[in-house]
Amino acid sequence: MLTLLSPAKKLLSISKHYSKETSNPLLLDKALQLVKIMKLKSVEQIADLMDLSRQLAELNYERYQNFDLKNNPMNHSYPALFLFQGDVYQGLNANSWKDEEIEYAQSHLGILSGLYGFLRPLDRIQPYRLEMGVNLENPAGKNLYAFWSKIVTNILNQILAEQSNPVLINLASTEYFKVVDEKKLSYPIVTINFYEQKNSELKMIGILAKKARGMMAKYIMQNRIDSIEQIKEFSESGYLFNKEISSPNSLNFIRIH
């Protein structure tokens, strides 16, 4: 199985070199095409493109201006698994993982990215911000879906072909998973959702669902889960699988308050 996550906007402030083994992103050449486009953008254009405050636009302008096109490992880059710091990654809590769990995740966990397309946990990346839903004109079209869809779908097919149980577990957001061309994907997709139940009313609450997605990814990696039935046994933080509102392609977990 291959489990997919979204990236995070919040990033680790890199202060030290990551000393253990890392990898280069599989689609780095394509990513650098986008970096070159972003290097030509002004602070104002970046603010408009991503609907950012002046302060955030200036930060990301500097990031792109300083982006090392050679991806030198020593030059302010860091493994994706540890660089991303948002709600999903709080649930994932990768700093608590053992080396062998990270090694397992390298071939069983993927992160979709607006800039890099697809990332493995130990892929060394530079700080950036570029959401998948952004309308960035590029050689392939008017947005990043046009740029990445075929490429990302192909790489997912290649990775899934090497899995003992080739199923794509979708823990990514709708914005990011839209990049996957489901018609061209050769393998089954199972999407996992998390709901809160209060007074018999079901709600998906963004921040809680994100954290739960991270916890589920952690559960799958640390226990080397390789079947749908094992996924259904997940019960962290009070979430329980609900058969009544689930289907073969959609596993739904509920936490009762």
From Swiss-Prot:
This is UPF0246 protein LPC_0782. One of its GO terms (cellular component) is cytosol. Pfam families: H2O2_YaaD. Belongs to the UPF0246 family. Disulfide bonds: none annotated. It comes from the Bacteria. One of its GO terms (biological process) is response to hydroperoxide. PANTHER family: PEROXIDE STRESS RESISTANCE PROTEIN YAAA, PEROXIDE STRESS RESPONSE PROTEIN YAAA. InterPro entries: YaaA. It comes from Legionella pneumophila (strain Corby).
